[in-house]
Amino acid sequence: MSSSFLSRPLVSVYVFAMVTMQLLFMQSVLSLNQTNAYLNHICIKGEGIVKGSSYEGSVKSVIDHMSTYLDYGFVNGAGSDGPTNIYAKLQCRADASESKCRSCLATAFSEIRKKCPNYKGRIIWYDNCLLDISSIYTLAEIDYRHIFNMYNAKDVSSDTMAFNKNTRALLYALKEKAISKKELPYRRDYLYSAGEESLGKKKVYAMVQCTKDLSAKNCSVCLSYILSKLPKCCKGKQGGSVLSPSCNFRYELYPFVKT
């Protein structure tokens, strides 16, 4: 027997496993929010695997309920399958429309079921959303364990030092803007900010975002932590990002978000 409920606060998941990987951005991602490219997924072995046929149906029930509450760009839900608790959260990118958010949830859940069948803990990232499913309830905590980075294959052609410095400054400025926004009802851009900076004849475009279960203080901590990885992951690259289940950033030399 399964049960489920919804609540506005999101759930961060404390987990055992850690996967770090580097990927190249695909050409299909280069358009302005026109695709929903798959980015990465993690099957969390530390939480175990559920035997039996009813578990996936119980998880689907939670996801189906969540799909009706996407006007804010995020939602979390909870339920159970016998003794196994089910917690799920969805965070859509703030510039994604409600229809794109709903479509991303459907795609993410369909794919994570194939990639990590019956896993209690599993996370999947797409260009437009993050879906995090777990058997462990931890509210408003930062997940430091499941972080990965991506970068554009192309290097900056000139003045790499100035490019790195200006990109870093832009990202930190966006972090401050994101955490200073007031949490108004149904505000999609809470804990999110996007902007651009001129670099001679070019511009760098960037965004930062935290999941909305975090406080502004924890959002700042999370973003500062992943921004500290910028030199190692993306130094001299025309584009790059670092993503976790709690926060992420991205920058490019082309516009990729709606402003």
Curated annotation (Swiss-Prot):
GO terms for cellular component: extracellular region. PROSITE patterns: GNK2. It holds the Pfam family Stress-antifung. It is found in: Secreted. Residues 37-138, 144-256 form the Gnk2-homologous domain. Disulfide bonds: none annotated. Residues 1-31 form the signal peptide. Keywords: Repeat, Secreted, Signal. It comes from the Eukaryota. Belongs to the cysteine-rich repeat secretory protein family. This is Putative cysteine-rich repeat secretory protein 25. It comes from Arabidopsis thaliana.
